[in-house]
């Protein structure tokens, strides 16, 4: 199952998201996907417990540039997430193309206790 969304902030396109789920999550097609996918999953008893995030850069394709209202080949943030449940079973993967002029990433760190 693939869900494509264009995230808007203050009327401006900010993020193109492509989220992929296995067929096990076909019930999502009956849901309102304009809100939080995590809230929908939690409502259905599916809880994210962790995952992996990779952040890089990419250049926009013509289609991506049109959606984000930027020039083709413009540098964007590229983020890939893999989210898992408490057993480490993948729930979904998500690729995001993010306009860095309209988005901020904040990473909180914790001291190593080992």
What feature does the model see in each segment?
Residues 1-114:
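C-terminal all-alpha effector/ligand-binding and dimerization domain
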């Amino acid at each position: 199952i693939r869900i494509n969304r264009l995230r808007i902030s203050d009327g401006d396109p900010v993020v193109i998201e492509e989220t992929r789920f296995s067929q096990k999550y076909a019930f999502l097609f009956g849901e309102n996907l304009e809100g939080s996918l995590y809230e929908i999953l939690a409502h259905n008893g599916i809880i994210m417990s962790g995952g992996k995030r990779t952040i890089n850069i990419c250049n926009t394709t013509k289609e991506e540039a049109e959606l984000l209202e930027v020039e083709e080949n413009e540098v964007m943030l590229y983020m890939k997430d893999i989210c898992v449940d408490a057993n480490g079973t993948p729930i979904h993967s998500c690729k995001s193309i993010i306009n860095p002029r309209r988005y901020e990433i904040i990473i909180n760190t914790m001291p190593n206790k080992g």
